[in-house]
Amino acid sequence: MHLIYIVMAATATTLHASSSAILDPSDVKIMTKNVESRIGNDAAFAAGRFLRGAYEDVHREEERMFGLKQNQHSFIKPSQAQDAAAIDALNIAKEALESTRNTKDHPHATATAGDQSLNPLIAAYPLRASPNAGVPQQHLGVALGSVHPHTSRST
């Protein structure tokens, strides 16, 4: 009887802990911060911070110092190459964000505004026209060696 009670109590505690971890936004925020780089200056970190907004950049130095205290044994000072990569990523992110805002005015944009908001880097690079852009569909088949739809086969 005691064994059943212990198993039930352990199961209830585990379920409560897992459900509170899933539903608690602060736990989710901590988990997403752990996914990011501890260095703070690599390209993915800089681009992610920029795309999420400037508000988090205000507290970036505080977070870096907190990370330094928490992870003194594994903290790595960013190199010049990482700083250059962060600057490049930040410039690409800025261009992507600006071109996303100007999607309606972009002459080569074929994606919808919804697609642009899902992937802002789509707008960073101009879309290339297809090599067969001006060729009517019926002539494409002839160019590829198939039978033209308006010709008849006589055997």
Swiss-Prot record:
* Keywords from the named record: Host cytoplasm, Host nucleus, Secreted, Signal, Virulence
Q: Which InterPro entries does the entry link to?
A: RXLR
Question: Where does the secretion signal sit in this chain?
Answer: 1-17
Where is this chain's protein located in or outside the cell?
A: Secreted; Host nucleus; Host cytoplasm
Q: What is its main location?
A: secreted
According to the UniProt record, one GO cellular component term is: host cell nucleus
Q: Where is this motif: RxLR-dEER?
A: 49-64
Membership in a protein family: Belongs to the RxLR effector family.
Q: Record's domain comment? A: The RxLR-dEER motif acts to carry the protein into the host cell cytoplasm through binding to cell surface phosphatidylinositol-3-phosphate.
Instruction: Say what the protein does.
Output: Secreted effector that completely suppresses the host cell death induced by cell death-inducing proteins.
Entry protein name: Secreted RxLR effector protein 38
